[in-house]
């Protein structure tokens, strides 16, 4: 999920999920 933060730039939804993963 943390990796989704970087890939989240492509998908807004994944970006939000990625940030939650970091937190």
Curated annotation (Swiss-Prot):
Coiled coil: none annotated. It is found in: Secreted. Belongs to the Frog skin active peptide (FSAP) family. Septenin subfamily. The lineage of its organism: Eukaryota, Metazoa, Chordata, Craniata, Vertebrata. May act as an antimicrobial peptide. GO terms for cellular component: extracellular region. Expressed in skin granular glands. It comes from the Eukaryota. Keywords: Secreted. The keyword Acyltransferase does not apply. The keyword Secreted applies. This is Septenin 2c. It comes from Osteopilus septentrionalis (Cuban treefrog).
């Amino acid at each position: 999920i943390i990796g989704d933060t970087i890939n989240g730039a492509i998908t807004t939804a994944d970006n939000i999920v990625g940030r939650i993963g970091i937190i």
